[in-house]
């Protein structure tokens, strides 16, 4: 009996030893800060969200402060946080065109920037409230305005590398996205950003490869950046086919209740995804966004049973497109017509997640508001028209006055011929 008690006590003691608290390794203790401040190069596309970690800091520093400079040595430096590092921003509250100080967040010493814009390009510093810097980034936000779309199914090839002496300009592609639809033919694409290779880059910037940085990096001298300005980002698109994941079947009891409620007739329409209803005035524009989608996600759009493929509906494929998908995965409908009514389904990462039932109403009478962008655009066109008419009217009268003053105007009055007797 004593032997049994001893065995139990030894087992209990061993179990207690197994539950010792293991302290998590502190990354700041094993990551020394560089003795000479270098800049890590990073490139993103417009409207992307990205994170800049602060991998090193002294142990006595409990909170970091992020700083921003447009150019190295600039006298104007933005402080991107309060001096306690407690600024928080929800990504869902960020809109396109929001100020930079609204589109960022500090979490666990890292800087998060939402929906980045080209004007956000520059230098980001992680440091203290006293202005001591630990780590720095060279961020290049490339615009999607002139983005070149390449469709592999049509036999198109990406842009070729450009050579200007020792300067090489090329495109670096990201990984392929997942197929944007399942069960039917879908599409997948990869984003390509502009990079260059040159021996004339600043040595203070850390390169991804030897002498290779993004085209908008601060390491690129101004004369080299001008040569690479015509090389736009690329979008490579190809077809794909992916099976749908099997979803759990509805329980038989739930289906029995559903059949009982719907009685013996036709069952009511039950949407497979959440549907949002929206009414739009005839002739006005509309932009639909897919919930939770980002530019790097695989997003697709359908109208009822029609698939809106990028090979036909991507922005820039046809200059006169009224319905198109931009490079940020938004669906645009310009000058809404009655035939635009229907349900628009949104796919994200190969799964259909939401629908938008669009209704189109006749214009009728509605109060004019100067906050309406279409009202402002119409007033702007009217003012430009009046200004052109005024300029033409004044120019004609000035010309006539000059003619009469200097007496060199031709006489355009018809001459009357005398009748011959």
UniProtKB/Swiss-Prot annotation:
Cytoplasmic membrane side: 399-421
- Cellular component terms per the entry's GO annotation: membrane
Which cysteine pairs make disulfide bonds?
290-346
InterPro entries per record: FAM187A/B, Ig-like_dom, Ig-like_dom_sf, Ig-like_fold, Ig_sub, Ig_V-set
- Family matches, as PROSITE patterns: IG_LIKE
Gene3D superfamilies attached to this UniProt entry: Immunoglobulins
* Ranges of residues in domain Ig-like V-type: 268-362
Instruction: Look up the domain of life of the source.
Output: Eukaryota
Q: What does the record say about its membrane topology?
A: Single-pass type I membrane protein
What Pfam families does the record tag this protein with?
V-set
Compartments annotated for it: namely: Membrane
Q: Which residues are glycosylated?
A: 318
Q: What keywords would UniProt list here?
A: Disulfide bond, Glycoprotein, Immunoglobulin domain, Membrane, Signal, Transmembrane, Transmembrane helix
The signal peptide here is: 1-18
Q: Which residues lie on this side of the membrane: Extracellular?
A: 19-377
* Principal cellular location given in the protein's record: membrane
- Membrane-crossing ranges are 378-398
Looking up PANTHER family in the UniProt record yields:
FAM187, IG-LIKE V-TYPE DOMAIN-CONTAINING PROTEIN FAM187A
Q: Which family does it belong to?
A: Belongs to the FAM187 family.
**What name does UniProt use for this protein?**
Ig-like V-type domain-containing protein FAM187A
**Organism phylogeny:** Eukaryota, Metazoa, Chordata, Craniata, Vertebrata
